[in-house]
Amino acid sequence: MDLDTITSISTPMGEGAIGIVRLSGPQAVEIADKLYKGKHLLNDVPSHTINYGHIIDPESKEVIEEVMVSVLRAPKTFTREDIIEINCHGGILTINRVLELTMTYGARMAEPGEFTKRAFLNGRIDLSQAEAVMDFIRSKTDRASKVAMNQIEGRLSDLIKKQRQSILEILAQVEVNIDYPEYDDVEDATTEFLLEQSKEIKQEINRLLDTGAQGKIMREGLSTVIVGKPNVGKSSMLNNLIQDNKAIVTEVAGTTRDVLEEYVNVRGVPLRLVDTAGIRETEDIVEKIGVERSRKALSQADLILFVLNNNEALTQEDYTLYEVVKNEDVIVIVNKMDLEQNIDINEVKDMIGDTPLIQTSMLKQEGIDELEIQIRDLFFGGEVQNQDMTYVSNSRHISLLKQARQTIQDAIDAAESGVPMDMVQIDLTRTWEILGEIIGETASDELIDQLFSQFCLGK
């Protein structure tokens, strides 16, 4: 890989207590020393130390910033290269001036994800661990961050490497069979060993895939849409679940004119809550846009919370809306139980059949616990799995595991049908390659570049 030194701001832009400019590469310390004035040259201080001083413009001699500089020497760093982290006061102006000086004196602006890419290319982490870094940064709940951290620590990598090693052992036995075809006992032993080991590999792949649905929910959140006719209490429900007044709650029907979205942790289940504009015919241009977005959100939802008003009898609009959502995963909520009951609960039950029904009062915060328990039960069978398990949460990994399951099954079918071993070998080798794509050992350069381009600058 390139031996140049890269630089970037690694903290969010804007006002804050601290902003960090990070450098990585063989000239990181040398470049920093051209700008830094402190008690000692950075080149002379021990690794993994923080040093007080100032950043000086070498040309004008102007003091740019008062800083603390971290010196981290290869190979015991994230990138396995020399790393310098210049800790500045937070703010846009001075941190950009420091960044510009690092580039003026020899560093190149890092591409998105390039620090993590170097960690991968230098063997510090594999591809699945690199992807988990972004999952960790983007995680919205404690459980999601724990699942990502397990992957960063190599839990998934270790399992994949173990299965690939098992395939290599099978291939070695197959090679013996190909080299000595005249020995029937060798062929019989090879077939027996191949089938036994291949079925174990398939079983492990299936076990990982079984975690995929829950893993994806933990990674991305359960897309949960709150739907109902206007003014049934959808926004109040959103506010109670997120305990934040983001949605506008008024007595005027139709005041939610956009799709409002929040993440919330409901009894260990990360929900991506979406409050929609009421779905109805309207001549208002702005409201029409909100309704269209609501329909799109419904089509992409994992769970729908269908809200009815206890204070009003069922209307044709309620029936029409329920027809739209009834074939999805739905929980029906009769809200405003604090008001006079004008809805016929038996009529509601006739309409929804076996769909779960919860009665709530968002004003008095009644029924919220029952709703949260129902959400958990619907998707996790009443028990959220241990977060220390190895989950597969990445869509790319799930797709590759499905491909590997198919190719290992092809090898099993071929062996059981008496297909020549050199043909079985093709399916086994392909399985080994597919699993290698998960951890990056057989991934193409184009795929690697594409994955890291999705990272943020400075990471």
From Swiss-Prot:
GO biological process, one term: tRNA methylation
Entry's family note: Belongs to the TRAFAC class TrmE-Era-EngA-EngB-Septin-like GTPase superfamily. TrmE GTPase family.
Class in the EC hierarchy, top level: hydrolase
Binding residues annotated for Mg(2+), in chain numbering: S235, T256
Subunit structure: Homodimer. Heterotetramer of two MnmE and two MnmG subunits.
Binding site for K(+): N231, T250, V252, T255
Organism field: Staphylococcus aureus (strain Newman)
The protein's name: tRNA modification GTPase MnmE
Gene name linked to the record: mnmE
